[in-house]
A protein has these predicted regions:
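C-terminal extensions of enzymes
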Residues: 87-157
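Glycine-rich phosphate/ribose-binding loops and adjacent secondary-structure elements
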Residues: 1-84
């Protein structure tokens, strides 16, 4: 249902089908991978997702951060020795700079593709874990709105 249809149509179908699904069973949506689509689907009762976006984007030098997307092949990162996502606790952000990752990508070193993919997988794990925590606190809708405003504003691809 999620592959090829406009997002608004997908959301409409989710809203229609949600009441028809068993309450105690997990709800899976295939092929949904943008942060916006994932959070909007969670809002509509979806529990699980899978998509190629984290790996495909990583193989193309694009990484997801809590502030937005980055295209690390861009020349603007050639002398940027800061972390991809300051304060994000994963191996990529702790150990590699934007400039170093850009260098790896531009010389065709496979490590660069792997590190970008690891960053993206870490980001999406953080996104869903944080969404779950915000649901438990009763503040999901406010957090989602704040996150998406910040994230979509900073799409640096």
């Amino acid at each position: 249902m999620a592959v090829g249809e406009p997002a608004e149509e997908m959301y409409r179908i989710l809203e229609l089908s949600h009441p028809l699904l068993p309450e105690k069973k997990p709800r899976y949506l295939m092929g949904v991978g943008t942060p916006e689509n994932i959070l909007n689907a969670i809002e509509r009762g979806i529990d699980m997702f899978d998509c190629v976006i984290p790996t495909r984007e990583g193989r193309n030098g694009r990484v997801y951060t809590r502030q937005g997307k980055m295209n690390l092949r861009s020349a603007k990162y050639s002398a940027d020795f800061s972390s991809i996502d300051e304060g994000f606790d994963n191996d990529v952000c702790r150990n590699y700079s934007r400039a170093y990752l850009r260098h790896l990508l531009n010389v065709g070193e496979l490590l660069g593709l792997k590190l970008c993919t690891l960053q993206n997988i870490s980001f999406f794990m953080w996104l869903t874990a944080t969404a779950r925590a915000e649901i438990q606190k009763g503040s999901f809708m406010e957090w989602k709105q704040d996150f998406l405003e910040r994230f979509n504003y900073n799409d640096n691809t």
